[in-house]
């Protein structure tokens, strides 16, 4: 993406009132993009932290900024990207003209980027180097919920693409709150080696605490540094969340660039 000195980038994260580390990857990606000097301004806002989405309405007061690219740092389309963010940022479609004459451009979430499969494979290789993929099962862990299955659909889509490559003995999507459950990993895998990659944007409570417990990794400390975990005669390799991958900064930049190439569809705000 070429430099856009008359444009700003707003990265929207979920944040957390419980775990301050939840926003760390989003802030880190923003810092890296800012360092590259591609935009006049790069900043973040959050649903559960400060600065809030409403605060963002008062950002970008420089008259030289004509366009604001809004990229949700979310793993999939869903309630927050289709309803909460448009409502809080007062967006009325893919493009919103402000009274200040700025144009706010609402981009697709980072998790829907076409290169997500390669990032997942990269993370899997990093966490289990020199482990033969042909003797390994790869598990992609999504949240899964009865309220909104978009995260589950997104995880399943990635799994189908990775499975089609035929690199691993098996590639499965598993979830925290719906079948197939990550807690059943021992029953649904047959290989000695099992690699687990959380399909989340940050190492929040789910990926740092909940999923390891569901897997049976109960030792304190850095779960990834302790790889492989020897459980029930298996070698279990556990990764940090995919959203902590440094190349996520490139994903966010490319989602902004993609807007001008093909405007995304935005569901009506309810």
Model-predicted segments: where are they?
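Active-site-proximal alpha-helix that buttresses catalytic centers in soluble enzyme cores
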Residues: 1-270
């Amino acid at each position: 993406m070429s430099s856009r000195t008359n444009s700003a980038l707003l990265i929207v994260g979920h944040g957390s009132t419980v775990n301050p580390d939840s926003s760390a990857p989003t802030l880190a990606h923003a810092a890296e993009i800012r360092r590259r000097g591609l935009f006049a301004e790069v900043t973040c806002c959050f649903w559960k932290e400060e600065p809030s989405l409403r605060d963002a309405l008062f950002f970008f007061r420089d008259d030289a900024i004509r366009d604001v690219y809004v990229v949700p740092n979310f793993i999939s389309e869903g309630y927050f990207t289709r309803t909460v963010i448009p409502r809080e940022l007062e967006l009325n479609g893919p493009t919103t003209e402000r009274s200040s004459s700025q144009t706010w451009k609402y981009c697709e979430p980072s998790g829907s980027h076409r290169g997500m499969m390669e990032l997942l494979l990269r993370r899997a290789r990093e966490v289990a180097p020199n482990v033969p993929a042909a003797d390994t099962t790869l598990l992609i862990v999504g949240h899964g919920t009865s309220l909104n299955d978009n995260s589950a659909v997104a995880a399943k889509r990635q799994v189908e693409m990775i499975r089609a490559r035929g690199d691993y003995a098996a590639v499965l999507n598993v979830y925290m709150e719906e079948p197939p459950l990550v807690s059943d990993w021992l029953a649904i895998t047959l290989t000695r080696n099992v690699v687990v990659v959380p399909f989340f944007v940050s190492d929040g409570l789910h990926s740092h605490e909940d999923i390891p417990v569901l897997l049976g990794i109960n030792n304190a400390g850095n779960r990834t540094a302790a790889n492989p975990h020897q459980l029930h005669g298996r070698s279990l390799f556990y990764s940090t969340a995919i959203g902590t991958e440094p190349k996520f900064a490139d994903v966010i930049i490319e989602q902004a660039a993609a807007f001008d190439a093909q405007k995304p569809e935005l569901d009506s705000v309810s």
